[in-house]
């Protein structure tokens, strides 16, 4: 919402600077998005009076004027404006004055007639682009006065605020003024009476034919209005700052009331309403044609306002094009309606939001509806004339639309919340300034929030509301009363674990990304087949209608997006929650913290010293081993080849930590690769961090001063036996000794009948207390080979 500071000061004018006023708006919980100064400088622009207006040629609009601007002689000016006439006061740009667009006024001939200045419209002043008629000033403004001195063009500031859904009071001048009054402990804002007497008895009967919907409806007929009049300048200026100014007087009046008191109103052509107003649910396939000839087919859950034969409008001021008033309309129907938020949500599913729907989504104060009707009537009749009919009212389930929460606020809870003492009299005064109804007892208050605060539901809401007026800066800073000692063994290490992993991956060339937890269910089905999806009841769209079971869909979507933008080498990782069905959990849903990554395309950038190659399984496996080495230790995890749905059957594996499954890695399945238009070299990994409960803590020890002793062996073993199983047995055998085991050769040939493979394994022995003797090393190695022969039927090659 945008507004100008002078408009706000018409409602509440504390003796503080503009900067302080803006700071108080922020302190009240309303964010200021932008501030712009309005300080027009119109040198040489004077108030003049047309004393003579001659039209020498009837076929031409040009008029020859004599204008008095307070000089010794009258100015000759040529003007073509349609509203140019004798005895009106105007704005005159004199010779050598400069227009806002940079043009300089000079003496010139127009149609052989000398012109010594320009009669200005708002358009020439750079204010209202569609106002091409010359400005007509009030009669009481003296001739020759500089227009910079006019009140209507004085310096001002316009402010744009952003309002959260829980603060509808910030969507109007009235709401902001109430907050400023409370902060400065000023008198409550009182609404001026705007009631005009009725002069006719005409009205439309109103019926509500829906039991489930909550509706509060006001309507009034106003006859014999003149909608061909110009909008008053004071209203134009305010709406200009709000970016809501139009050339339609009805739109301007409705927007003025919307910004000033936060009440949406609607106006229809009364002559086209057939006898009655009926509020009902739409009939299947019923439609509405809008002003731009757009046709909207309505569902049965859409609330409509109709007459006997047609729909008039639906909530959000989405009107039937036939009912829109124009400048020739003489009789209008002024309405105010309030419906429940469910009705608004049903409409938002069907069409895009607009300014009026935004107000209804935030919440509208039901207690101001009648006042808004009276205020709009007052403005319409004062500006456009007309005869006023009575206000007709109809309500259904009104209690659900009004704010009537009774909340118990304990003094002790308030002080405990801020860990300080605030006297009960101060709290009571703030509550009264905020216009709560208060019943005070010895230890607590019964409070009733004002009608415009729909967000105040519980005691903590009231405490927060009091504190924004009390000012958080007034709460003293106090140290913790208790010393806390954290045991690293019991402390939750998931956050530092993630940070440690993130730093390592970034150092290896990965970029961290953040994707939505809501994803497209069809994409999830492709990547994770045969899954139980968690679908969202009211999704933003179909692409965001399922909770993610894995980080992979988001990672692959990011790779696809970047590939389509000429990126040839990509490494991404993400950390976030994934969700799955688990009846043993609260709400039947389990959430786990996952870490996932993807590599795709070329391994490195193009260079002169090596041939570019695409990434492969072992590139990802190497990154993952480095990661697991940091977070849980190299000896604790295993990577086992297993088929995984969504991954290539020959290039996929599962990761185990202490024999518990914690994740997967592998190449994306060719079908998915083709569907997502990915490189033929895309590899993924994912780790569940719920099982990784602690970081690896390193123990330091002295380096042995004794030399190492190395032995190499070559063994024949079945191709079906993974090397991981062999090295695990060897490590278990040497668990209490310092032995480093490494695979340095793999060999296979026809001599082995293609059923066996030869493995070259090195053993490096070392002792911290003595120099190992040859027979000791040979004996340990002999015993290890003996176990391998027994368990895997290995044959020692010579």
Curated annotation (Swiss-Prot):
GO terms for biological process: phenylalanyl-tRNA aminoacylation. Gene3D superfamilies: 3.30.56.10, Bira Bifunctional Protein, Domain 2, Ferrodoxin-fold anticodon-binding domain, Nucleic acid-binding proteins, Phenylalanyl-trna Synthetase, Chain B, domain 3. It is found in: Cytoplasm. Its cofactor is Mg(2+). It catalyses: tRNA(Phe) + L-phenylalanine + ATP = L-phenylalanyl-tRNA(Phe) + AMP + diphosphate + H(+). GO terms for cellular component: phenylalanine-tRNA ligase complex. PANTHER family: PHENYLALANINE--TRNA LIGASE BETA SUBUNIT, PHENYLALANYL-TRNA SYNTHETASE BETA CHAIN AND LEUCINE-RICH REPEAT-CONTAINING PROTEIN 47. This is Phenylalanine--tRNA ligase beta subunit.
